[in-house]
Amino acid sequence: MDARYEEKTFESYFNNELDRKTSIYFPLGQVQEGVLGLDSVARSNSRRLWKTLGYPFWFFQKFSGVELTTIAREMEQHLGREVKNIPAMKVNLLLQYKRPQYITNSTGAEWHLWNQKYFRYELYAQQHALLSHIETTFGNDAVVLYAAPSVVDVDDLVTLKIANSIIDNTNFRRARELDGHHRNTYIKAGTYSQACSEPEKIENFNLIEMIEAMQPHQSVDNAQLIINFSSQINTAMENVEGIGYLKTAFENRMNESRHYELQQFELFYSMLTMSVFREVTGCQWLIPLDGQKNA
């Protein structure tokens, strides 16, 4: 059976706890997405439309509007100040959240690996090909993880949230560790996983300890780190083979912004690129910062 809660609920609880336990930058949080851009933009000279929408002065001259390049220029300055005024960035962290199934009887395909109830989630071939490529080829610039809770019911998830224990009850796997497999299975967060097709035992690790052990980039400043990473992501989306619909969706969305020649605003365009990447892949982009927090 599927775990009885929404994946977005787990993601929200997880991110909130991660922010409390370590120093982290959420480049595409809800607040910044609200500043970065709009969900959709339309322009119309139709007086009838403005009247229908209830604008009280529809009989005056049409709105002059604001050019998108003007907004982009302002946002370039805003984002530049923001990333300059935070601690040094360490690495780009991509998290793919998974809501598992909970297998409760011996007819489960992987039961013989555990001989008890266990959790399982599927790997989607095109998505995994992309994530594995990113982690394998980006070197020290990126860490790519699957994150899946060892919780069945939403009330248990809420209990863990209150206890500040969501992360301790999450199973983590690096993307490249699951190459050649189509599923990952586990019984609880702090133990090993067994990946399938051909069973392979994979040891778990402590996410917070891994983040705290990372060292900040010395060669580039925060803005350049973001610009470089988004450029790598853009290249990967263009060149990785076997990602089908992900490539098509990404290109279609990016072509909308290229039409307005937004590439001249490097930091703004980088954030836009990563926003589209998240929209298409569902992958959360986080950046650990230099400095520690007490859990």
PLM features: residue spans?
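Acidic, metal/cofactor-coordinating or nucleic-acid-engaging core segments within structured domains
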Residues: 18-23, 85-93, 100-246, 251
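Active-site ExK catalytic segment of metal-dependent nucleases
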Residues: 41-43, 50-67, 80-113
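A Trp-anchored, charged/polar loop motif used as the substrate-binding/catalytic surface
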Residues: 66-79, 122-133
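Acidic-basic catalytic patches of nuclease active cores, encompassing PD-(D/E)XK
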Residues: 1-36, 41-53
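Enriched - but not universal
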Residues: 61, 114-117, 272, 288
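Catalytic micro-motifs at enzyme active sites that drive phosphoryl/nucleotidyl and oxygen chemistry
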Residues: 25-31, 76-85
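Charge-dense, extended regions
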Residues: 248-295
